[in-house]
Design a protein with these regions (language model features):
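Class I S-adenosyl-L-methionine
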Residues: 1-19, 23, 106-127, 131-208
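Class I S-adenosyl-L-methionine-dependent methyltransferase module
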Residues: 16-111, 115-116
C-alpha cells in the first residue's frame, strides 16, 4: 500500500503475487504504462516540464513520469529538478524505474483508497503511508489515526509491516535506520530522520 516508486516492492522477488496500490492516479498510470511498454523520454526540458504541469491529462503516463521523476526530491511537481553539475534527472529516473519494473511485470497496479483494497487471505502487507502530520500528495492532511486503526484491524488476519518514524504504543519497531533529508535544491536545509519498520504487537512472534 502507498507503493510510490516501488523501490521496496521491486526487491521482494520471492512473492508470486503482488498487488501494488496507490491513490495517486498519475503514478498508477505511469506504472501500468511502463509495464505495458510505454517508452519514456531520456530528457525533459524545463519548458516541457512547465507545459506538462499545465496540461496534465494530455498524457497521464508522461505526466506521472515528469511530475515525480523530473521534480526536485521526487515531490509531485515540486519544481524542475536541476543541480550545478547538470544531472539529467529524466534519464536517471527512467533508468531507475525500468530497473525496478523488471521484477514487477506480473504485479497488479491499482488506484484506490487503502481502505478499499480487497485483501486475499493471509496477506503480507507493506505500507509506506505519508508521515504523521503531513499532507501526502494533496492539500488535505493525512489522517494517521484512521490509518493506525486500519492497521490494527488488518493485523488480526494478516502480517502488516509499516514504514514510519513514529507509531502508537501497540506497534513495535523491528528495524530502524537514520537518513538525511534535504528540503531545497541547494542542500542547505538538511536534517536527520530515523525511518522505522513497525508491526503490531500481535504479530511480533511471527516476524522474529
Amino acid at each position: 500500500m502507498f507503493c510510490g516508486s516501488c523501490s521496496v516492492e521491486s526487491k521482494l522477488t520471492f512473492f508470486t503475487k503482488k498487488i501494488l496500490n496507490d491513490k495517486h492516479e498519475y503514478l498508477i498510470e505511469l506504472l501500468n504504462g511502463v509495464k505495458n511498454g510505454y517508452e519514456l523520454p531520456d530528457y525533459i526540458s524545463e519548458e516541457q516540464y512547465k507545459y506538462i504541469r499545465a496540461h496534465k491529462d494530455e498524457d497521464k503516463i508522461l505526466t506521472g513520469f515528469v511530475g515525480f521523476g523530473c521534480s526536485f526530491g521526487g515531490k509531485w511537481f515540486g519544481g524542475y529538478a536541476r543541480n550545478k553539475t547538470g544531472t539529467n534527472y529524466a534519464a536517471q529516473s527512467k533508468k531507475s524505474l525500468l530497473k525496478d519494473m523488471v521484477t514487477l511485470q506480473e504485479a497488479e497496479f491499482i488506484c484506490k483508497d487503502y481502505r478499499e483494497v480487497v485483501l486475499p487471505e493471509n496477506c503480507i502487507i507493506y505500507a509506506d503511508p505519508p508521515y504523521d502530520n503531513t499532507t501526502g500528495y494533496g492539500k488535505e492532511k493525512f489522517n494517521s489515526k484512521k490509518f493506525w486503526d486500519y492497521a490494527r484491524d488488518a493485523s488480526q488476519n494478516h502480517i502488516m509491516f509499516i514504514s514510519e518514524q513514529t507509531a502508537p504504543e501497540d506497534f513495535i519497531s523491528i528495524w530502524e535506520k537514520p537518513f538525511t533529508r534535504t528540503l531545497d535544491v541547494n542542500k542547505s536545509n538538511q536534517f536527520q530522520v530515523t525511518e522505522k519498520l513497525f508491526v503490531h504487537k500481535n504479530n511480533l512472534n511471527l516476524v522474529k
